[in-house]
Amino acid sequence: MKGNSRHPSVPPPPLAPQSPTSKATAKYTNKDGSKFITVPKGSTPADSAQPSPTITTAANAAPGPQSASTSHTQGHGLGQAEGQVQPVNKKKAKRRQKAAAKAAATQGIANPAPSNGFPSPSPSHAQQSTEADHDDSHDEHLEEFNNRRDSRASNIHENGFAQGATTSSKKSKKKKKKSHAGQNAAELPNSPQHDTYVPAPQLSQHPRPGISKEKIWNTSSQEERERIKEFWLGLSETERKELVRVEKDAVLKKMKEQQKHTCSCTVCGRKRTAIEEELEGLYDAYYEELEQYANHPNQGEAPPMLGRRPSFGSMTGMRPRGLPTSYPSHHQPSHAQIVDHGAEEDDEEEEVEEEYSEDEQDEDDYSDDEPSEELHRSDYPADFFNFGNSLTVQGGILTVADDLLKNDGKKFIEMMEQLAERRMAREEDARDQFGSPFSHSAGDRNAHYHPPADDEVDDEEYDEDYDDDEEEEYDSQDEEETMTEEQRMEEGRRMFQIFAARMFEQRVLTAYREKVARERQNMLLEELADEKRRSEERLVKKQKEAQKKKERQARKKELQAEEKARREEEKMAEEKAKKAEEDRQKEQRRQKEEEKRKQKEAQKKAEEEERRRKEAERQRRNHEREENERKARELKEREKKAREEARLKEKEAREQKEREAKEQKERQERQERQEREKREREAKAKAEMEAAKAAKDKSKQEDRAAQKAAALATTAPVPITLPKRPAQPIQTSVPAAVPALPQQPAAYASPVIPVATPAFPKVPAPAQSRQIHQQESVTTSSGPTSQPGSAVSQNPSPHTLTPILTSPGPVKPPSKSGVAVSGTQNSGVQLPSPAPSTTVNAGSKPLQSQANPFGGPSMNMPFQPTPQPPPGFSNHMQPQYPPFYNPANSYNRVAPGMMAAPPGFSAPLGGRAMSMHSPGFPGPLDSPVSSFAGLPAGLSSLLGKDNVPSHTRQGSGSFEIGPVSSSSQPISRPTPIGRPASVVHGQRRSPEFSTNGTDQAEQEVHLGSSALLEPDDTQQDFPARSHFGLLGTSAPGVRSAPGFGGGPFGMETGFSLPHQNSPWNPVPPLQHNPFVPPPPGFPSSSHHGPWSQAAPPGIMGRNPSIVERSAPWSVTLRKSLCAVCEDLGAGGSSSYDGFIPLGEIMAHMKQFTVNEKEVLDICDTEGNPSNGGGSFIVRDPLSPSGSPLIRYVPDDDASRAPYGPIKHPGDIGSPIVGSGSFHVGS
């Protein structure tokens, strides 16, 4: 066949008899694990079968004399399994399984199998054997069909639904079809063994051992049927109607919905209408008959629809009554037992609800598949409540509606026709064999059936197998007469009624099972509570036992602990002793190491202390050395200051004494001078006439002398040594004034012009020799008065009527020590003319304008044009004026920015006012642009006796040149050579000294060379010279007049010669000219000029010997810082080992607008001779809020030696005075 061709199989051999010692059960579990099935391998006798919703066994009644058939035993076992629910405790389940296996083994020994190996049927199945003997030959095909269906269902349940029921059912079906004929042939000789009959009540005489006596858990099939009947009769009318009512409308509605998309032609519509009408008629007829039977359940005859109950061998595994009873042993269903894991009743309840949740579609599930067989109800035709063996509805089986939709109901009608014919034949045979339909019990109807799921039964294969069977059946029934149309319709109604009846049975069975499930659930809850209580009791008992056991163990442990503690104590004592010994040894080693460490530390500490002591001693020595040095330095400074103060005090005392002496002397001299002047005026009046004549002669001689001097201008000077003459007593009265000879320096030879000497009173010789001596010394004036009898009148008479007589004489050479003429002295004095016999009257009338023999302007008209100079002189004859000279106001004028000297005082060395002098003649030494210095003796005498020096000896190089007194002084006795008071260290001449005559008297006493001055004293004159070079080094008195070249005969003329130092000579091209170019008409010098880098002396008010270069601001600041640090360090202001706080330094540098950072930056500058030298040490402040500390370290003397001051004239190593032009003899 089609279905078997796809799954060929080999028929298995017959099973051997069960051994009593073999394992009696096999265990199966469903998919979800909620249930497991234990199936005994051997058959055991049972009282009866009960309906079960989960297990269905095939009733394969083999012929034999056994007291219980396989089907009967199976039904009993299943009923017992259904009623029994395993508790939660697994131990009880195992005990029950063992008891069931033991009972099965015992039953197998008591009822041994026949020699052919097939079990003998029970006596209650004798009717089945009898029916098998009367089966007709035309039923063989149906028997084969049913056997195949039975084998399929049996094989499904033997293997369990949870273990792949689909595959097992297919294989079993194929095995049945192939091996059925041979098996039947082999079993036919044993068929007479089934003829024995045993009444049904004997089934209850063999209760199953090990089963609980509670009937709710353990009931037989018969008892369950009785219970179902009692349940039905106990229901009310409404409950019965509710159970038996079939939802006709739901079925029709479902059919309409399924046919909605089918063909809508008229033919199909008529078919659908006919089917619907037929179904309605069938349902209505079924309701009427069911109601009649329900109202009369105990009638003798069963209703027409229940005359014969259909047998669903294809699904239940039960063999029809008319079939042979010889089946192979492997079709024999095993005794099965269901064990639920907690809620069997709930699963059954849910299963039943699911079965009826599809709007009564399940009613048709049995109309297509199940009517192929029928179950003979001859043994209980009137027992309606002996319901079909476990009608569990499952999905997936073809329903009536599906059949009607697929093949228009043709298959359904044909199936019902065939079944009707076979049923009728079997019923007739059964009536013929058994007289009464109630003579047999339903012991063989106890098998339960569980329809397979959708995936376990292949509907297509089922239909194919069914079609093949039908073909074979139709082939074997060709000779049978066909039924009429009315019979087919009647048979269809009966088959539908059978289907509806079975559905009714299913509903009643479901309701009953729901009730039983509830009862079992309650009982289970009670058992669970009991089990829980017993468990709690057992738990308490166990706890008590455990407690006792713990106590025993505790006592035992205590003993062991005591023993162990004792051993531990002994062991610890030993270890303690051992450890004490080790500790003692370790302590000894530690003490030794500690002693060594202490010794090392002591040694190290001693070394450290020694090092610290040495370091402290070294620091102390350094500190002491520094302190000693500082103290020595301070002591030296203090001694130096003390010496200076003592020297100053001595000088002040001496000066005070000298001033007092000079004042006394001046008073005396003033009185004497007044008397002398009176006598001189008288003498001058007498000699006025001779003086005029003498002057005329002298003028002629001077002209000749000037020509001769011009011729001798180029001759080299010859050093002349003049002997000194002792001073003579001063004559107090002179009969007549004799013109004084012109004063000449000792280094020049003066031409002597012989002139006629008038008859004048003879001048004493000492006075003449003294005049020669005065040319070699610095003159001083003791007062304005002159002594009578003096040969030289040095000041004009205060009386205006006194004439001044001049005599011709040689031209006066330039004077090295001129007189600074102040404004008060020169007021009212006119320049006299050198003409002979000229009388100057200062009070009555001005002098007459006379021609200047040297081409200069006249004396009373100094600004007239001058004639050409004599031969041999420079051609620069025009007046050469300095840049700041104003010829209109020449007297007592100073350059812009220069300070003029007060009246009666000589201008200081560096800032003398410019005085008018004759062009071509240099000024005096102390006034570089002075007037009247260098005039001829006659003109000099006209200026007054105060302007003529009485002592003209030049100092030997001192920078301090005192002003010349305006009055003639008597020559006193020479004193030993000593240090002049004017050059005392650190002293300057004050203006008051020049007025009261103290300096004059001092210079009279202190004559001689300045070479005896101390070198260190001379170095203090100009402190700046220690760091700056001087621009000029020529000594005063021997230098040329500034701006004017030297004239012939060693004279300093105002006429510029080539290569002479003149401020109006051309400026050298390489020199920087910081000033404006010279004005037009002023010649330039090839050397130094006023617009060169070195300003001319007198122009800027500075002596060329001490003019300094302009220094940068940083150099000035550093020099000031050096001076401040030296002053503070010398004064003991530093209290930090020579370091001075920056705050104190800033307090002494207020004249500079600098901050601390600039001062600190200046401290980092390297010292050199130009910025102060030395170096600075800066230390961090001692406290965060303090200021840095600065210490100035000056350079040593060796480093300063090359930059020392230039020696003064007369010092050892000083430059040669006059650049070797002359030598002054002593």
Curated annotation (Swiss-Prot):
UniProt entry keywords in alphabetical sequence: Coiled coil, Cytoplasm, Stress response
Keyword Coiled coil (UniProt): yes
Compositionally skewed regions (Basic residues) per UniProt: 89-99, 170-180
Biased composition (Acidic residues): 343-372, 454-484
Region (Disordered): 1-225, 294-388, 423-491, 526-727, 757-876, 944-1001
GO cellular component, one term: cytoplasm
Coarse class of the protein's main subcellular location: cytoplasm
Coiled-coil regions listed in the entry: 517-708
Compositionally biased residues, Polar residues: 45-59, 113-130, 326-335, 791-805, 822-852
Pfam families assigned to the protein according to its UniProt record, in alphabetical order: NST1
Biased composition (Basic and acidic residues): 131-152, 211-225, 423-432, 442-453, 530-548, 556-706
InterPro entries per record: Fungal_stress_NST1, NST1
Keyword Coiled coil applies: yes
Compartmental location: Cytoplasm
Similarity field: Belongs to the NST1 family.
Function: May act as a negative regulator of salt tolerance.
Designated name of the protein: Stress response protein nst1
Source organism (scientific name): Neurospora crassa (strain ATCC 24698 / 74-OR23-1A / CBS 708.71 / DSM 1257 / FGSC 987)
